[in-house]
Amino acid sequence: MVKAILGYDIEPGMTVEEYERWLREEHLPDLKRIPGLRRVVFNTVKGIVRGETTFYRIAELHYDHMAAFERAAKWRAQNPVSFKRGPEGKTAFRFYVVCETEEIEFDV
């Protein structure tokens, strides 16, 4: 599995309520259209253990493999969303990385 992992804050001037409404009513339906995107996970940050960097949220976009991510990236470049629907002016990205995932489960 491959995950695109994004850390971000909400742009100044936008309330949490406005952001969440935009995210769920406009942005999520657009994400759902992306070929190969299997799952989206939102991790709302409640505290920082080390360092001073803060984030509103860490998001994960799940793909089956790197080729699926690359096809999705190409599709997104060919099918851009409008400014109103896209994250510009709403989402202040702090990082955006693509990771190959290894999950280890423990018996409890």
Q: At which residue positions do the language-model features occur?
A:
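Macromolecular interaction modules
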Residues: 1-108
